[in-house]
């Protein structure tokens, strides 16, 4: 493999994408300096270290021709699968999930990198399996993509990490729909979503005379079931299952239009807000900087999505296009779920906000994904 950047690649560097990403990273570190202010451990310094490592990794990814990455998609995918399996034997358990490898003071979450592995492998499958005379996928051709998705989805789900499993599922579904599927499969998917909604309504919303085992509750872990209950009716148990959602909405709502000011947030300062440097980092931002700056942050995320889709539409091959769509889908669904969770529209799932939340594995995986977008854009006129 050759590591190089040629002069003719430079005009195709997506500077808008890079600026938007670095702007969100800078706002994230600034926000973490407030979320982790004394007397608590200041994590923003560690996040700066992780950012430095991540930027170095992005530069390395940009130096490699992404056609070599295409050839390595299967080994990358299999390596991540093996890491997920190894978690069952050597993983570190925290917050009820066996999701991390602990190496001294550092922890690594393989599921974060599995998301990239799934995107790369799906892109390779759709590139290699392309048939000009049959562009859309029926059930007989769809088994390969579904198998690629099912194995990591199941391994992450049994950790149990429902949030990350859902992110793998949603980003993969976006890629599969982008790859064109037959209309009857889309109709089946819509029916399945409606059926799932009916089941959840039956389990959690419809009043029943006495507690009873139901379809969803029987298969979910206790804390997962409590999160759904707390989402649907947070006021029913404000000190238990509804605590996270209630405190988060108080923080977001109290920020008003312009916010309370940096390090002036009461929910943050008094530590009422749980996981405020990770899952609920957007609540800190909303309380201290208000509605206007929340819009600024959303505009930056929107710019990342638009520039990323532009990379996909201008890619010179199917692999590059599918990788770009997969990366954008992965980031979009993660932002959608995290902010939806913070404002009470979606249940709490433990999903972090890309580039804003504290965490080395999360930041590195997102930046590697951005590196893939930059790589594809730089080489769109190379072959």
Short names for language-model regions:
Residues 161-166, 261-265, 277-278, 349, ...:
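Transmembrane helix boundary and interhelical junction motifs in multipass membrane proteins
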Residues 18-34, 38-240, 283-341, 368, ...:
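Hydrophobic alpha-helical transmembrane segments of multi-pass inner membrane proteins, especially
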Residues 167-168, 264-269, 300, 342-350, ...:
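Re-entrant/interfacial helical elements at transmembrane boundaries that shape
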Residues 86, 153-159, 254-258, 337, ...:
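Transmembrane alpha-helix interface/packing and boundary motifs in multi-pass membrane proteins
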Residues 1-9, 64, 194:
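N-terminal secretory targeting signals
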Residues 1-5, 32, 333-383:
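A juxtamembrane structural motif centered on a specific transmembrane helix
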Residues 4-21:
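N-terminal membrane topogenic signal
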Residues 246-292, 319:
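Long extracytoplasmic/lumenal interhelical loops at the membrane interface
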